[in-house]
C-alpha cells in the first residue's frame, strides 16, 4: 500500500503471481501496470526500476541479471547506466531513425523498451539493429478541438516488398573500457520467430539462448513465410555463424502458443535439446551441437511437450509438461509433469491427478511445487519430491464464499467436430438459477486462433471474461476450441492453414447443435455469437457464412481482411499474399467478400486509435454492407486502442443490451452503469 499509494486488502491482493528473488529474500510483483521489488525481511516494496544500490534505472530500460547495469535507448542508440556510480556509457553510435538498435517501435506492438537478452555474467547483450527504412507507414487520426493529429508508424502488410529486417549483434559492455560491437557474419534476418508473431519474448529476444560461459549465442532464424527455421550458433567474439540444421514444414514451423523457447543448448555434453512437430506432435529431439546431426528422438507417441521444466544434465534426464493425448475420461489439454531420459527411455508420469498442473522446480531440482485444478474444481497446491511423491499439501482453495454468493462453475464438455469423428472441447456457462423447463438462447464466445482458442486456461478461474455475467441475463454461453487451434496434434492445429476465413465456424455450429440435442433447455433457433480481435473477424464471418444459423452477432475490433493487418500474422497462417500462380491468396478469406449474405442483426465495433488491428478493417466491411444495402449497427470508439481501456465497460454493457434486445427479445434497462473498469481494491 505504501509503495503504490493505494489501499490494499490482505485478503484480495492485487496480484496473482510473483517471481522469487535469487536470494530467496525478495519477490517481484506486477501491480496496476507497475513492477515492484518487495523485501520479505523488511516488508517493504520499491519500484523494480530501482536497485539495491539506491540508484534508479532509467525508464523503459533492461536491467542486467546482477542488477548493476541498465541498458536503454536514446536517439536510436543503446546506452548503459552503471546503477552504482550513475555513469552513463554510449554503447552504439551509428543508430539513426528507422535503423536503430534494439528498437521495438514498430508493427502491431511497440514500446520504448529495448529488446535485449543479457549474458549470464551481465557483461554482454544480444540484440540487433532493426532496419525499417523503406517500410510503409500506417496512419491513425486522433480527434481534438481544432486540427486533428496524425499518428504514423512503421507497419508492413502482407505482400509488401520491404518489411523489417534485423542485423544481429552482440555488444560487449567492457566496464572500465570501451564497449565493443560484434556483428554476426550473415545477412540480415527476417523479423520473425518460431514462438510468436513478434521477436520479443519475456523481455528479451525470442529464439535465442546464451551458452553458460557467454562464449557463444545459439539462435533460430525463420523464413518470411515461416516454412523454414535454421538453428544457428554465433561466436560471441568473432561473430562467425554456424548453421547446424534446417527445420521445414509444409505449413509453418513453430507454435505461437508457446511464447518461449522450447529448446536448450548443453555445451558441457556438446548437445542440443530441440523441438519439432515433424511427427505430428510436438516432441523433443537430441542433436549433436557441433555437427547438427540427430542423435535420437527423446519423446514419442501421441501427445505434446508443452514446456521444459528442468534439465538434469548430470542424470541426463528432462522434466517436461505434456498434454494432447486422447485418453478416455481426460481432457487432452490438461498438462502433467513427466520425466524422461535423454535417450528417450524411462518416461514416467509424476503428477497423476486428472487435472491441469502448473509446476515450478526448486533451484536444485529436488522439489516441485505443483498447483493443479480443472475449470470446475478449485486448485490444490502441493510440494512434491523429484519422483512426484507428495510431501506436503501447501494450500487448498476455499470456494465457500463464492458459492454462498451464488457462483457456480462452468460445465466442461466435449462434442464432435464438423467431421463427426474428432472430439472438440469447451465450456458451457448457464444462469445460476437455471430452469431446465425453459428455453434459453445460446451465445457463442469465439476466438478462433490460430495461436490460441476460445476456452483459455484449463486451470481453475473464478471468472472468464463476462461469460457468466452474460449467462445471468438469460443465455447459455459456450466457448469451444475448434479444429485449427493449438494444444492438439500438428494436423489439428494447422487444420485451416491457408483458409483463415474458416475460423473454426463449422465446428462451432456442429458443437452447438450437439449441445442443443443434449440439453433441451438450449434454443438452437436463437443462436448468437461474439468475439474480439480474431474473434471479431470470426463473429462477423459467422453472420455472413452461416446467415441462417446465427441470428445476432457482435464483432469487436476484427482483423476482417488480413491484407490490412500486420505482415507476420497473415504470412504465417494464410501464406504469402500472391500464390505461385500469380493469384491473390487473401481476398477469398476477407469478410467484405461475403457481407452481402447478412440476414441477422450485426454490430461492428472498433477503436479509432487501434494500433494493433487498424480500424480500416471494420471500415471495409461497413462499406461492403452499405453497398449491399444491408442494415447493420456500428459503434466506433473515438480514443480506444485495441483494448477499450476506460470505455471497456461501456462496450460490454452495449453488448449485453444488444443480445438482450435482439436475441432474448427483452428490453434492457436504459443506460445501465456497470461501473468503472480497472479498479483494484
Placement of each model-derived feature along the sequence:
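Serine-hydrolase catalytic core recognition
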Residues: 136-137, 183, 205-207, 214, ...
